[in-house]
Swiss-Prot record:
Organism: Vibrio vulnificus (strain CMCP6)
Localization annotation: Periplasm
Subunit and interaction comment: Component of the periplasmic nitrate reductase NapAB complex composed of NapA and NapB.
The protein, known as: Periplasmic nitrate reductase
GO molecular function terms listed in the Swiss-Prot or TrEMBL record: 4 iron, 4 sulfur cluster binding; electron transfer activity; iron ion binding; molybdenum ion binding; molybdopterin cofactor binding; nitrate reductase (cytochrome) activity
Catalyzed reactions: 2 Fe(II)-[cytochrome] + nitrate + 2 H(+) = 2 Fe(III)-[cytochrome] + nitrite + H2O
PROSITE patterns registered for this protein in UniProt: 4FE4S_MOW_BIS_MGD, MOLYBDOPTERIN_PROK_1, TAT
Length: 829
């Protein structure tokens, strides 16, 4: 073996060190230590796998495995920082129970719903799936099949799945788990502006004078963004931080003012602020007159429950999203009852504190950034709350300029990029189009090369309705990808678990690990994770980021994209389309669904030579799959305010914020000079509306569906903690994160604990009409609820706390309220 002088010096240094330690090294071994490629770490960029912040990380790989990650110093989002979860990304793919081959419930050598999980080949898995799907399609039609996806799908995975369901199977029964986190934000954006997603960007953090958190614990849930707020606050003494919540948490530690309000009363607080602005002549009349219209929301709209539920039957206008035009004077009259006295009485927040908050919004010289996540969205009036905060910013003209921003923070890494922009919701198509609009269907059918009438006009079953339809045997074949809804979703015992185990139904779960959802399924498909595949995510500030595959997957695991595309080969077009459609498109006769969807001359037009050598999906299908899907998808938005850059560009940058026009990203939408779609001379142009004007929408306080009573005397709020991601599927398999927070606990006020004879660490039973869980109490932790409320995180699979949550939703967004339901707490003897 030839040795350079440099290697010789290194080898001798290693040998000398070994000799001092009393170890003898062969010369060849010393040489290997000095010069072997085995010791080299290769670094490449990728967006973080966890939240919607969109941090970029550098991934270190060695010998086909991820061995390290670090914050990307070139990334404008996180500037080299990571949160504690991000620092342990290298370990999420290597849990000891990682699934490596398909598992089918079998007895006596064949599928049996009551059988044991048995390893099978991919062919057996897909053949079994196809048999079940074909039987359901033949018997009941396309409404009998469904899919539940994810804001953690890559852009390409979500696009392929939505295309397969809506164009191939002709079923709109596809919905993402983003229904549980961002649906109210989506409807809020669409009602007020006509276009989804924030108008501002993360640059606002460096310009704002006041930050107002409406139901968001950013210190734990968006910690990297929280560092930017912290830096702004500590380096600029005039800056104020305001935190509103139903319980005390870590974000209060930085707050200049904290506001603990009674559950649901945020509606009253927001209306009070609007009233204060009007009463104190703080309305920006020039902005309001030029750029807004006023509407009244239909009220008494129910709670998205089953039609036969007594609460739903009581509603005068169940599920109505209708609005009527009103004047400013009528709007003024609608908020007038929300005086400081009334708002204080309803919320429990002191009058002087409410006035202090309102003044920050009213002061024309104070730039305000409002921020929210699940506290506002997971709310039976979440859409209204989104609108009420927009009202405040529109009344004052504090919008779409640096530091003035109502900013809906996203929970998942691609809830924006995939669930929302791609349109994997049951009612949506890409680029904010909807299935109910014939013009939108026509655009999709043209891009997808479909005959007219292919895409059904009726929205499919949303997430909560999917559970009910599985329970009732209406939905029979169901594919779950990239989420753990059996643990995360509401009312587990009442709807979901009976639906999964309904003998009429066949449930497929694609996941890297044996989650609670997987264990309730009939077939489990092992899934590739993160950089085991190529993909793209879209974060909360409209930033699209792409990454290359960097390691191979484990065992026989395959990406969700591979699974969708490969499964589509099992169907001839005659098995999924009626004769009248085939007559309009005879070129598809005898073809497979794969041929129609993915070998269509568009998706498959980029040769394999353009892909990297390590790209398992592309090498399997014989063309550059990810680029083809991305470029076809991008056709929907280009020229329509959702412009994306060419796919290859994203591999050369740390993301771009759409719309990207002539190679330039957009920081502040709707503002002339920043947004290329804003008309010249307009100042502001809310071009999502036909007249270019945003809506100020009047909506009152309405009570939650349930409240504590004599038997169930405590509020329960569920949520997350810093160390774990959602249900802990990944983070609980990282030893350091698991050891840091091994178990969920019940955070309770010391006086509530004392009244029940409880001490810190005691085990309690938390129960209500929907179930019960056992958990230990914590009276001194990071979360400190007021009397009458407890907080329990949902990451712990041993404590399925969300089984207690009522499956009531916002009737407009169909998003569940996980933040308030009545429970009782008793000590376990």
């Amino acid at each position: 073996m030839k040795m350079t002088r440099r290697a010789f010096v290194k080898a001798n240094a290693a040998a000398s060190a070994a000799a001092v330690a009393g170890i003898t090294l062969p010369a060849s071994a010393a040489n290997l230590i000095a010069s072997s490629d085995q010791t080299k770490i290769t670094w490449d960029k990728a967006p973080c796998r966890f939240c919607g912040t969109g941090c970029s990380v550098l991934v270190g790989t060695q010998n086909g495995k991820v061995v390290a990650t670090q914050g990307d110093p070139e990334a404008p989002v996180n500037k080299g920082l990571n949160c504690i979860k991000g620092y342990f990304l290298s370990k999420i793919m290597y849990g000891q129970d990682r699934l490596t081959q398909p598992l089918l419930r079998m007895k006596d050598g064949k599928y049996d719903k009551e059988g044991d999980f048995t390893p099978v080949s991919w062919d057996v898995a897909f053949d079994t799936m196809a048999e079940k799907w074909k039987a359901s399609l033949a018997k009941k039609g396309p409404t009998s099949i469904g899919m539940f996806g994810s804001g953690q799908w890559t852009v390409m995975e979500g696009y392929a799945a939505a295309k397969m369901m809506k164009a191939g199977f002709r079923s709109n029964n596809i919905d993402p788990n983003a229904r549980h986190c961002m649906a109210s934000a989506v409807v809020g954006f669409m009602r007020t502006f006509g276009i989804d997603e924030p108008m501002g960007c993360y640059d606002d953090f460096e310009h704002a004078d006041s930050f107002v958190l409406w139901g968001s614990n950013m210190a734990e849930m968006h910690p990297v963004l929280w560092t930017r707020i912290t830096d702004r606050r500590l380096s600029h003494p005039h800056v104020k931080v305001n935190v509103l919540s139903t319980y005390y948490h870590r974000s209060f530690e930085l707050a200049d003012s904290g506001y603990i309000f009674k559950p649901q009363s945020d509606l009253a607080i927001a209306n009070f602020i609007a009233n204060y602005i009007i009463q104190n002549d703080a309305v920006n009349w020039d902005f309001v007159n030029k750029h807004t219209n006023f509407k009244q929301a239909t009220t008494d709209i129910g709670y998205g429950l089953r039609d036969d539920d007594p609460l739903q039957k009581q509603a005068k206008n169940p599920n109505s999203g209708n609005m009527t035009s009103i004047s400013f004077e009528e709007y003024k009259k609608s908020v007038a009852p929300y005086t400081v006295e009334k708002a204080s009485e309803m919320s429990g927040v002191a009058q002087d504190k409410l006035i202090e908050l309102a003044k920050q919004y009213a002061d024309p010289n104070t730039k305000v950034m409002s921020l929210w996540t699940m506290g506002m969205n997971q709310h039976t009036r979440g859409v209204w709350m989104n609108s009420l905060v927009y009202n405040i910013h529109l009344l004052t003209g504090k919008i779409s300029t640096p530091g003035n921003s109502p900013f809906s923070l996203t929970g998942q890494p691609s809830a924006c990029g995939t669930a929302r922009e791609v349109g994997t919701f049951a009612h949506r198509l890409p680029a904010d189009m909807v299935v109910a609009n014939p013009k939108h269907r026509a655009i999709a059918e043209k891009i997808w090369k479909l005959p007219e009438g292919t895409i059904p006009p009726k929205p499919g079953f949303h997430a909560v309705l999917q559970d009910r339809m599985l329970h009732d045997g209406v939905l029979n074949c169901y594919w779950v990808q990239c989420n753990n809804n059996m643990q995360a979703g509401p009312n587990i015992n009442g709807e979901r678990l009976p639906g999964y185990r309904n003998p009429e139904n066949f449930i497929v779960v694609s996941d890297p690990y044996p989650t609670a959802t997987a264990q309730a399924a009939d077939l489990i498909l092992p899934t590739a994770m993160w950089i085991e595949k190529e993909g793209a995510y879209g974060n909360a500030e409209r930033r699209t980021q792409a990454w290359y595959q960097q390691v191979g997957t484990v065992g026989e695991a395959k990406s969700d994209l591979w699974q969708v595309m490969e499964f589509s080969k099992r169907f001839k077009m005659e098995e999924v389309w009626p004769e009248e459609l085939l007559a309009k498109a005879p070129q598809y006769r005898g073809k497979t669904m794969y041929d129609m969807l993915f070998a269509n001359g568009q998706v498959d037009k980029f040769p394999l030579s353009e892909a990297r050598q390590l790209n398992d999906d592309s090498h399997h299908f014989g063309f550059y799959v990810q680029k083809g899907l991305f470029e076809e998808y991008a056709e929907f938005g280009r020229g329509h305010g959702h412009d994306l850059a060419p796919y290859d560009v994203y591999h050369t940058v740390r993301g771009l914020r759409w719309p990207v026009v002539d190679g330039k990203e957009t920081l502040w939408r709707y503002k002339e000079g920043s947004d290329p779609y804003a008309k010249k001379g307009s100042g502001w142009d809310f071009y999502g509306k036909p007249d270019g004007k945003a809506l100020i929408i009047s909506a009152p306080y309405e009570a939650p569906p349930e409240s504590p009573d004599a038997e169930y005397d405590m509020w329960l709020c569920t949520g997350r903690v810093l160390e774990h991601w959602h249900t802990g599927t990944m983070t609980r398999r990282v030893p350091e994160l698991y050891k840091a927070v091994p178990d969920a606990v019940c955070y309770i006020h010391p006086e509530d604990a004392k009244a029940r004879g409880l001490r810190r660490g005691d085990e309690v039973l938390i129960s209500n009409k929907r179930g019960e869980v056992r958990v230990r109490v914590e009276t001194r932790g990071r979360n400190r609820p007021p009397q009458g409320l407890v907080f329990v995180p949902f990451f712990d699979a041993r404590i399925l706390i969300n089984k207690l949550i009522l499956d009531a939703t916002d009737p407009l967004s169909k998003q569940t309220d996980f933040k308030k339901c009545p429970v009782k707490i008793t000590k376990v003897a």
